[in-house]
From Swiss-Prot:
GO molecular function: rRNA binding; structural constituent of ribosome
Similarity field: Belongs to the universal ribosomal protein uL4 family.
Keyword rRNA-binding: yes
Source organism superkingdom: Bacteria
PANTHER family noted in UniProt: 50S RIBOSOMAL PROTEIN L4, LARGE RIBOSOMAL SUBUNIT PROTEIN UL4C
InterPro entries recorded: Ribosomal_uL4, Ribosomal_uL4-like, Ribosomal_uL4_dom_sf
Keywords: Ribonucleoprotein, Ribosomal protein, RNA-binding, rRNA-binding
Gene3D superfamilies tied to this protein: 3.40.1370.10
Compositionally biased tracts (Basic residues): 60-71
Region (Disordered): 46-85
GO CC term, one of those recorded: ribosome
UniProt name for this protein: Large ribosomal subunit protein uL4
Record text on subunit structure and interactions: Part of the 50S ribosomal subunit.
Length: 210
């Protein structure tokens, strides 16, 4: 179990909250998280790259020039891979890059990744509570009050973010907003800081407890 200090939106301390998630053994955690990240990135690939082989290139029914007497290397077709515009040897064809991973392993990897970032977490009691309308500068100033630098990549985790918060964060290049029940290993590890709403911590423990 880990205890986090909670902050208010104005940056003042307001109390403490506990985060208790089962994690993988230290001997296997790195491999588990590595496989989870590989799976996530591989499954994002479209796999639609396609090239033409020698048999698929248009033309080439006749010999481009006679066999002897030209001083050039002999050629039997303009579709040969040796010529510009010819077929491609062992080029990519449409395929699936999807990798499988058991649900139990995926959830364990996510819990382990999240708990490994405890030192970079900021628990906020009332994230964006003062916003009455979408305003990017209010979010930037609020993150600064929490001790987060403009150059840092930030993952904001909220239970059910409002449209005002979504629109306010949308234009900030290094800040990403995600719902507490839609976490993924890559985003957790890719961020420099994690800002978590207090209600989101309860949601995380409810959804990912086992």
């Amino acid at each position: 179990m880990t205890t986090l200090e909670t902050l208010k939106w104005d940056g003042k301390k307001s109390g403490k909250v506990s985060l208790d998630l089962a994690v993988a053994k230290e001997t296997s955690s790195a491999d588990l998280i590595h496989r989870a990240v590989l799976r996530q990135l591989a499954n994002k690939r479209q796999g639609t790259a396609s090239t033409l082989t020698r048999s698929e290139v248009r033309g080439g029914g006749r010999k481009p020039y006679k066999q002897k007497g030209t001083g050039r290397a002999r050629q039997g077709s303009i579709r040969t891979p040796l010529r510009p515009g010819g077929g491609i040897i062992f080029g990519p064809k449409p395929r699936s890059y999807n990798l499988d991973m058991n649900r139990k392993e995926r959830r364990l990897a996510l819990r382990t990744a999240l708990m490994s970032r405890v030192s970079d977490m900021k628990a906020v009691e009332d994230f964006g509570s003062t916003l009455k309308q979408p305003k990017t500068s209010d979010i930037i100033n609020g993150l600064a009050r929490l001790g987060i630098q403009k150059t840092e990549k930030v993952l904001v985790i909220l239970d059910s973010p409002s449209d005002i918060i979504k629109k306010s964060i949308n234009n900030i290049e290094k800040v990403k907003l995600i719902a507490a029940d839609q976490l993924n290993v890559f985003d957790i590890l890719n961020a420099n800081k994690l800002v978590i709403g207090q209600s989101a911590i309860d949601k995380i423990q409810e959804v990912y407890a086992s």
